[in-house]
């Protein structure tokens, strides 16, 4: 009897297991409706003559989920915006520089809280600006602590960067450390001879810190920065079209630059002779903070590596724990002066990325997900990595001034859908 009862119980359990519904997979963020919404948005930007050309690429759960390109990369000559169009990525150069720096971190070459002076005596005995006297002479005090590598990674070093600091801005202009004829070593020596604008670690201020990161890569590795970046980041990722210099044979697909006057509603194509001067010549200075060009596919390979916790298609560029470190907020609450960073939303700052630390507080803020990390460029380009939804997005355009039409917010809304106060995009 026991045998039959056991058999019956086993059959009942097996039937119940077979009939139990499989767990429901989360719906993708980018389905047909989302793709149509993105298409409509990008087309509207072109139709309304707010941009000449625009393209976007989204990967989700390891697959291409969206690609679209609209308008012209060169409106005057009728060249369409395409997947292989080359654009100036400006400050989206910075995360690539940070990645190069962190490959050295992984070898034990430095610690984040090491002082710069451990590797670069150019930054010894620095003074800090406190104002000017009645005669306009700068007033200075000693640094309370040395600049650390963490400071240059999160923009708290104190390097001057603005044209409106009495006395200090004039000294910065005279030293001209970012002149493209300088080498990185000459640049560092000139910054080291200038006063800092504020005490290291006291506030967040966007500036030349990532250019100093490039110098540190060169100093610690013993290789020219361009070569190190190529060997340790670009080549392993197959980013063959991410370069400081665009050769003659590729210039036909190198996008023109445009300037929008939102009030007048006019979109002007800028002369290549000025807009592309950085990329049409070989200059001594390889800036870590900007200067690279890239194709949409190339930059997505970088974003996918980050989404893959440091690995793309079996090639490891960074360890998972290093990517996590870079995508962690490194700004303590004591750093309350943060310039325009709060305009990016509920964010802190990691190692060359903004890091979302809270959901959007209102529909007016940029949409996004806690844990995402991102950055953008002066010509209105954008990328982000969303580990929560296993999603990465890249938006390419060449538009000055920086995002005058809220295209970043609108693109994020198109990807994630309307803002809701109760749930993050992709949450159940």
Give residue spans per PLM region.
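Structural recognition of the beta-strand scaffold that forms the well-ordered cores
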Residues: 55-57, 88, 151-154, 205, ...
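C-terminal motif of bacterial Sec signal peptides marking the signal peptidase cleavage site
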Residues: 15-16
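Short, surface-exposed beta-strand/loop micro-motifs that present aromatic residues
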Residues: 372, 379-389
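Sec-dependent signal peptide recognition
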Residues: 2-7
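Short, surface-exposed loop or secondary-structure junction motifs
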Residues: 126-367
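Short active-site loop at a secondary-structure junction
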Residues: 47-55, 76-149, 198-209, 287-290
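Short, conserved catalytic-motif segment at the N-terminal edge
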Residues: 28-87, 111, 125-132, 405, ...
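A generic structural motif
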Residues: 71-73, 274, 399
């Amino acid at each position: 009897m026991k045998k039959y009862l056991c058999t019956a119980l086993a059959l009942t359990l097996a039937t119940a297991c077979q009939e139990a519904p499989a767990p429901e997979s989360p719906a993708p963020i980018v389905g047909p409706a989302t793709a149509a919404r993105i298409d409509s948005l990008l087309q509207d930007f072109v139709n309304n003559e707010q941009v000449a050309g625009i393209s976007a690429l989204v990967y989700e759960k390891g697959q291409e989920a969206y690609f679209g390109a609209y308008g012209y990369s060169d409106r005057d000559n009728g060249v369409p915006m395409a997947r292989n169009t080359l654009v100036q990525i400006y400050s989206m150069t910075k995360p690539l520089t940070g990645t190069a720096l962190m490959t050295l971190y992984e070898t034990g070459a430095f610690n984040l809280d090491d002082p710069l002076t451990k590797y670069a005596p150019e930054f010894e005995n620095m003074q800090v600006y406190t104002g000017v006297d009645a005669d306009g002479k700068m007033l200075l005090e000693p640094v309370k602590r040395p600049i650390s590598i963490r400071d240059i990674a999160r923009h708290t070093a104190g390097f001057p960067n603005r044209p409106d600091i009495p006395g200090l801005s004039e000294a910065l202009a005279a030293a001209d450390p970012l002149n493209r004829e300088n080498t990185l070593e000459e640049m560092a020596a000139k910054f080291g001879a200038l006063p800092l604008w504020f005490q290291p670690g006291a506030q967040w201020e966007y500036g030349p810190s990532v250019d100093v990161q490039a110098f540190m890569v060169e100093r610690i590795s013993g290789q020219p920065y361009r070569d190190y970046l190529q060997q340790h980041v670009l080549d392993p990722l197959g980013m063959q079209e991410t370069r400081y210099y665009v050769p003659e044979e590729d210039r036909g697909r190198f996008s023109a630059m445009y300037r929008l006057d939102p009030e007048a509603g006019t979109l002007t194509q800028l002369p290549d002779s000025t807009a592309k001067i950085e990329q049409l010549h070989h200059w001594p200075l390889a800036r870590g903070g900007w200067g690279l060009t890239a194709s949409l596919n190339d930059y997505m390979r970088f974003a996918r590596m980050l989404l893959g916790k440091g690995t793309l298609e079996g090639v490891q560029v960074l360890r998972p724990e290093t990517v996590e470190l870079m995508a962690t907020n490194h700004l303590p609450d004591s750093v309350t002066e943060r310039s325009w960073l709060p305009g990016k939303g509920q964010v802190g700052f990691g190692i060359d990325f903004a890091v979302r630390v809270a959901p959007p507080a209102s529909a007016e803020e940029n949409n996004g997900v806690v844990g995402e990390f991102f950055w953008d460029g002066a010509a209105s380009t954008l990328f982000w990595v969303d580990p929560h939804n296993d999603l990465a997005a890249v938006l390419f355009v060449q538009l000055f001034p920086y995002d005058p039409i809220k295209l970043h917010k609108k693109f994020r809304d198109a990807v994630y859908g309307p803002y809701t106060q109760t749930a993050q995009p992709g949450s159940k």
